[in-house]
Structures are given as C-alpha cells and as structure tokens.
Amino acid sequence: MLSKDEKERLRGLSKEHAENVGLHMLAAYSIEEEEPELALEHAKWIARQASRIDLARETLAFIAYRQGDYKLALKEFRTAYRMNGYLDYLPFMADCERGLGNPRKAIEVASSEESKQLQGDAKAEMFLVYAGALGDLGLWDKAIETVHTLSLAKGLSGGYRMRAVQAEQNFLEQNGRSEDALALEPLLDKLEAQYADEDDEESSQDVAVDYDLEKLSDSKLEQIGIEAEDGGFRRRS
C-alpha cells in the first residue's frame, strides 16, 4: 500500500491513472528481488505514463540503481532532482558516476555546494561514496582517513557506523595493510552482530562504539565536514 506522502505526490494525475501508477509501483517493489527485470519494466512503464511526476522518475531511478543500470539511474535521478530539488538523491547520483567509471565526477558531486547541505544519513552516505571514489583513484590514505573519521561521529547511526568500519577494513586491505585491517575484526564483529540485519530505524544518539573526537584535529574534522564541538553532522551553507 502506498504511503500518504506517495499518494500526495501522485495528485497531479487523475484518480484512475494515479491508482494504475500506484499498482505498478507496488508491483515493481514487491517483485524486485525475485524478478528484477520485470520490476524494471514496471518502473519504466510508470516513468513513461507519469513522466512529469517526480515520484515516478524516482521509482525508476532507485530500481535501476539497485540493478546496476547506473546510466539509466543517473538520468532518472537527475530528472527527479530537477523536479523537486530533493538533496538526498545526491549520494546516489555520485555513486552512479562511480558505477559508470567516473570517480572524479563522483567527487565533484560530493564536493558541490548542494552536497554540503546534506544532513544525517544522507550525509553519511555521501561520505561513503566520496571515500569509495577516492579509493577508485588509488588515494587509499585519504579514503581511509575519511571513513575512519566518519566512524567516530557520535551522532552516526549504528548501521552507518558499521558500514564505515567495513569500508575502512576494505580500504586497508586494498592498500596492503592487512594487519591493520585484521585489527578491526573484533570491532566489526560487534557492530555486525548489532546492526547487520536491522532496519535503518536507529537512534541518532547511538553510542555502540564510544570514541573521542576531541583527539582529532579541527582541520581534519573541517575537511571531512564533522562538527568539532559535538562530533555530529552539521549543515554548512
């Protein structure tokens, strides 16, 4: 069943057409894992039939993204973004650039003025994408520093803390620092036991891993975009 917000976003269509689009949307999401190709066809139909509705383009963008069709996903995310200016698309747009083999473009998106306005989980997602793009370019030290600093943020949800440590371990291995990567195993085991199978409904005050950000320099925090005073995420204008 569509949420109240989703129904509201379909109000530009006639009642009958909105119901049809909604049914195809539900079908696309319900069969996405078992029949991805058919789900994508449903999403394409939605985008064709409701091309001026941002939710329709968003639906196709996310389904294409999860199936690795980054060219189509990027096109649809850009279209939806032009329609509604929804900043939380930006990390996915940057990751699409990575998927298309354009890490420098991903970094441009991550470093844009619009991305500086991201908050919470969307901001954390962008840092992970940014770090991945640095890794794509072989800039392992910068990639490691980014995810390590991210993992220390006290306002970070447990799921993103886990992903940051996973990324750090992967980058360390890629950089030939196997012993350092292995040293993260106990911490990662703890985080994965807590968060690997949970939905993303976690408290912003999560303190599963208690690090002290005061040990990091203000300049490093400024570079990564984390508030030095409280270790939380901040909006930079």
Q: How should each PLM-predicted stretch be described?
A:
Residues 1-5, 141-153, 157-237:
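Eukaryotic alpha-helical solenoid repeat scaffolds
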Residues 23, 56, 89-90, 126, ...:
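TPR alpha-solenoid repeat register
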Residues 12-48, 59:
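Alpha-helical segment of the N-proximal tetratricopeptide repeat
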Residues 32-34, 67, 100, 137, ...:
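Structural motif corresponding to the intra-repeat A-B loop/turn of tetratricopeptide repeats
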Residues 10-16, 44-51, 78-85, 112-120, ...:
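Solenoid-like repeat scaffolds
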